[in-house]
Curated annotation (Swiss-Prot):
Top-level taxon of origin: Bacteria
Keyword Transferase set for record: yes
MF terms in GO: 18S rRNA cytidine N-acetyltransferase activity; ATP binding; tRNA binding; tRNA N4-acetyltransferase activity
One of the record's GO cellular component terms: cytoplasm
Positions that bind ATP: 141, 163-172, 288
UniProt name for this protein: tRNA(Met) cytidine acetyltransferase TmcA
Family: Belongs to the RNA cytidine acetyltransferase family. TmcA subfamily.
Binding residue positions for acetyl-CoA: 411-413, 418-424, 462
HAMAP family per UniProt: tRNA_acetyltr_TmcA
Positions of the N-acetyltransferase domain: 332-490
Annotated function: Catalyzes the formation of N(4)-acetylcytidine (ac(4)C) at the wobble position of tRNA(Met), by using acetyl-CoA as an acetyl donor and ATP (or GTP).
Organism of derivation: Haemophilus ducreyi (strain 35000HP / ATCC 700724)
Length: 598
C-alpha cells in the first residue's frame, strides 16, 4: 500500500542518494516513470507553492509500497498561508487558499495519512535495484487483445484510470495489427507514446495531429490505415472528428480520471460527432499499485474525480457538473473554482436539490485609463480580463477595459437535461440577478467567449448576445476559432456594443478566417477598402507603439490595397509567406507605414 507523509521540514538525506530536482512546470516529463519515493516540496520564499497538476502527476509515479513525502512547513495553518501558485490562475496575484486546503486537510484526516516533523520509517534510502519487469498481461488486457481485432466496429475507445496499462495494451495491439495492416500513431505529445513503442517492439510511424490533418487535406495519405490515437481526450475535438471519420479503423486510448482534465464529457461529445460504429473497452485492474490503494483514492477525491461520492458543497457539485458536461475541466480550474478572486456563480436545482445547471462567471473591466491605453498600445498585458483585453487590442476598442463587465466563463447543463431550454432560462435569470446586484454602479455589458460552432452561435444569438470578435486563428486547446459576443445592459454599454458590432462587421470580409466561417456566421459582409479614423488610430499604434500585426491586420490590409506598389514590405502578411527573420521584418513594417500616417 502506498503512503503519503506530510513533513514540516526537510530531513537529512542518506549519503549516496541522488535527488533529481525539477520545477513543477516540468512535471510532465515524469509521466510513465516509476519511483519508490518522491519529495514534493511546497516551500516558497513568500509562503507556499502547491501546483495541483504536478502533485497528481507525481502521485502516479509512486510504486506499490512507495511513499510520497510532502514538505509543508506550518501544516496546521496552511490554509492561511499565501500560495504563490495562485499567480498562474488568479490574475497574477498570489492569495491564501482556505477553501482548497480545508478540502485537502479533510481528506488527509479521512485517509489517516501521517503528519509529522520526522517520519516513523527511515527517510529516503538508496532505492533497491529491481530486475527488469517482464510484461505480463492481466486477464482484462488479454480479453481485449483477443476480442478487439475480431470486432467489426470502426472506432474503438479504450478507457481507464491512470496506471492500468492502456499504453502497454495499445503497443501490443499495434504490434498485432502491423502484421496485416498499415498502422500509424498520433498523440498530443510525441513524448507520451514511448510506452507504446517500447511494447510494440517494432517501428510504428508517428505523426503529430496537425501534420496528419495536412496529409489528409492534401491527399498524401490513404484512408486505408489503422490509426492509434494515444490520450485522445487531450486532442481538440474537431481534429478527433476529422481523424475518426477518415481512417478505416481508429483505436483511441484515453484516461478517464486525469490530471489534465480530459473530463467525463469526452466520450459523450466524441461519439455524438462520429457517424461510425463504435465499441468501448475498459481497464479497471491497477498495475503499478494494489486495488483500493489509499493514495489513489485520496488523489481522486482531492481532484473531485470520484463519481460515486456525492459532493457535499456547492463548489464541488458544480465542478462535477462541469466535468460531466464539458470536454476539459482541469486541476487549475479546480483551484480557481475553490479560491480565485472576482468570481460569480449562478446555479439552478430541481425539487430534489439536484444541481441541474450552472454558470461560472468572472468580473472584468473597470481598469484605469492609463492601463487601458497601455494595453491597447501593446505595452502591458496584465493577467485576467480576457474579453475586455481582447476587444481593446484586437477590436481597437480601448473603452472595453474601462467599462464594467462580467464574462460568462462556463455554462453547463446536466447531459440528460440538455436541449430543454434550461440553459437559456439560466442565462436570463443570471443577467437579471447581475443587474439587481449592481445597482450602485450598473453593469455595462455581459460577455462570453467560446469555440465557434453553428450550435453555440445560435444558442447565444437566441439569448440576445451580439457577435463582436473572432480570433484570427484556431485555438490550440479547442481546435476552433473563438467567438466573443456581448449583451449590453447600461446605456453606455448599448452604445459600446453598437460600435463594436459595426467595427467587426466592417472588417469581417477582410479577415483571413471569413471564407472558412462565412456560411456559419450568416452575416452579409462587403469588402470596405476605404480608410476611416479608426484605421488611422490603429495604424498609428502599430507604427509608433507596439500594436501587433494581428491587432492591425484589416487596417494594414486597407492601406496595402491603396498603396500596394509602395508597401511591398507588407505582402508577406497577406500571403502568409513570412521572412526568416520576422522580428527585423516587423520593425521594417512599422517604419515603412509611418510616412502614410495622417
Amino acid at each position: 500500500m502506498r503512503q503519503l507523509v506530510i513533513l514540516s521540514t526537510m530531513p537529512p538525506i542518506q549519503g549516496g542518494v541522488l535527488l533529481n530536482s525539477q520545477n513543477f512546470s516540468k512535471a510532465k516529463q515524469f509521466l510513465g516513470q516509476e519511483y519508490p519515493f518522491a519529495l514534493y516540496d511546497m516551500r516558497s520564499e513568500n509562503g507556499i507553492c502547491f501546483n495541483l497538476e504536478a502533485f497528481a502527476i507525481i502521485v502516479g509515479t509512486i510504486q506499490e509500497n512507495g511513499t510520497l513525502y510532502l514538505i509543508c512547513p506550518n501544516w496546521h495553518s496552511v490554509e492561511q498561508q499565501i500560495d504563490v501558485d495562485a499567480i498562474r490562475w488568479n490574475g497574477g496575484v498570489a492569495i491564501a487558499c482556505p477553501h482548497f486546503f480545508q478540502h485537502f486537510k479533510r481528506l488527509i484526516n479521512k485517509f489517516g495519512f501521517e503528519v509529522t516533523s520526522r517520519p516513523q520509517q527511515p527517510f529516503i534510502k538508496t532505492a533497491p535495484s529491481y530486475p527488469a519487469k517482464l510484461i505480463q498481461f492481466t486477464d482484462e488486457q488479454q480479453n481485449i487483445l483477443q476480442k478487439l481485432p475480431l470486432d467489426p466496429a470502426e472506432i474503438h475507445i479504450i478507457t481507464a484510470a491512470r496506471g492500468r496499462g492502456k499504453s502497454t495494451l495499445a503497443g501490443k495491439l499495434a504490434e498485432q495489427f502491423a502484421k496485416t495492416e498499415q498502422v500509424i500513431l498520433t498523440a498530443h505529445r510525441s513524448s507520451s507514446i514511448q510506452k507504446i513503442l517500447q511494447t510494440a517492439s517494432i517501428n510504428i510511424p508517428f505523426f503529430a495531429p496537425d501534420k496528419l490533418l495536412n496529409l489528409i487535406e492534401t491527399k498524401q495519405i490513404s484512408a486505408d490505415h489503422l490509426l492509434f490515437i494515444d490520450e485522445a481526450a487531450c486532442i481538440p475535438l474537431p481534429i478527433l472528428q476529422q481523424l475518426g471519420n477518415y481512417f478505416k479503423k481508429v483505436i483511441l486510448t484515453t484516461t478517464t480520471q486525469n490530471y489534465e482534465g480530459t473530463g467525463r464529457g469526452f466520450k459523450l461529445k466524441l461519439v455524438k460527432q462520429l457517424h461510425r460504429t463504435t465499441k468501448e473497452w475498459q481497464l479497471f485492474q491497477p498495475l503499478r499499485w494494489s486495488n483500493h490503494d489509499r493514495l489513489e483514492q485520496f488523489t481522486n477525491e482531492l481532484l473531485l474525480l470520484n463519481d460515486e461520492l456525492i459532493p457535499l458543497d456547492q463548489n464541488s457539485q458544480f465542478y462535477h457538473l462541469l466535468a460531466n458536461a464539458h470536454y476539459k475541466t482541469t486541476a487549475t480550474d479546480l483551484r480557481r473554482l475553490f479560491d480565485a478572486d472576482q468570481q460569480l456563480f449562478h446555479q439552478c436545482y430541481d425539487k430534489n436539490q439536484r444541481l441541474m445547471a450552472g454558470i461560472w462567471a468572472v468580473k472584468e473591466g473597470e481598469l484605469s485609463q492609463d492601463l487601458a491605453e497601455a494595453i491597447w498600445a501593446g505595452k502591458r498585458r496584465p493577467a485576467g480580463n480576457l474579453v475586455a483585453q481582447y476587444l481593446c487590442c484586437q477590436g481597437n476598442l480601448i473603452e472595453a477595459c474601462q467599462l464594467k463587465s462580467i464574462r460568462i466563463s462556463r455554462i453547463a447543463v446536466q447531459p440528460d437535461l440538455q436541449n430543454q431550454g434550461i440553459g437559456s432560462q439560466l442565462v436570463t435569470d443570471f443577467m437579471q440577478k447581475m443587474q439587481k446586484n449592481n445597482k450602485n454602479r450598473p453593469l455595462d455589458f455581459i460577455s462570453v467567449s467560446f469555440g465557434i460552432t453553428p450550435h453555440l452561435l445560435t444558442f447565444w444569438r437566441r439569448n440576445g448576445f451580439q457577435l463582436v470578435q473572432i480570433t484570427p486563428t484556431k485555438e490550440a486547446s479547442s481546435g476552433y476559432h473563438s467567438a466573443m459576443m456581448l449583451y449590453p445592459l447600461s446605456q453606455q454599454g448599448k452604445q459600446f456594443v453598437t460600435k463594436a458590432v459595426k467595427q467587426f462587421e466592417r472588417d469581417l470580409a477582410l479577415q483571413p478566417f471569413y471564407p472558412t466561417l462565412k456560411n456559419c456566421l450568416a452575416i452579409p459582409a462587403q469588402v470596405e477598402n476605404e480608410m476611416n479614423q479608426d484605421d488611422w488610430q490603429n495604424l498609428h499604434g502599430f507604427a509608433f507603439a507596439q500594436r501587433s500585426l494581428a491587432n492591425c491586420y484589416t487596417s494594414l490590409k486597407r492601406l496595402y490595397i491603396t498603396h500596394q506598389a509602395q508597401l511591398t514590405i507588407l505582402a508577406p502578411l497577406f500571403t502568409h509567406r513570412y521572412p526568416a527573420n520576422q522580428k527585423v521584418w516587423l520593425q521594417q513594417c512599422r517604419i515603412a507605414i509611418r510616412p502614410f500616417i495622417q
